[in-house]
Amino acid sequence: MRDSLPSFNPEGLERYLEEEKTQTNSKAKDVIDRIERSLQRAVLEELKREFGPEDSGWWIEGVHKSIRLEVGKRFEEGDGKRGSKEHYFDLIHYRKIAMDKWELFQNILAFGKKGAGKDKGTSWMNFVNEKRKIISHASSAISLSIQDLMELQDYEGRLDQQLAARSTSESEESGVAAE
């Protein structure tokens, strides 16, 4: 209403609008945090399954050297206080790993048309990362829109579905292998 009638400004409207923006950013942060944890779990599980749980496997074979150097530097600068190396990845690193090891991740992390390619299939992670940057800086004058929040929630739901489908198919495969 205010967009069509700029003079509309009843008492308390400004405070209400600010609270709504804060709520949207707060909800978006929760969604993004869950997406990041899901990505971390999925990427690390897949790398360790494919290359082995030792650093000589998943870390060396599964993670591109440029990411290893960046993450390793942070690990060393932080004296490993956050835990092992995997606790030093950024959200966007998971996209780079997925693109680098596309054959492992295309069925798990790609959204959109089948066969659309690495860049398009993982572009949703760029969106999530850009929104993460906005809400991570409390001093930012930018708030996420309801539309942004809904898109983040949609990505979270799709990721959860794909990861659940992967778990189901892995369970079925291991059940068949055990017979």
Locations of regions flagged by a protein language model:
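Amphipathic alpha-helical interface elements
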Residues: 1-179
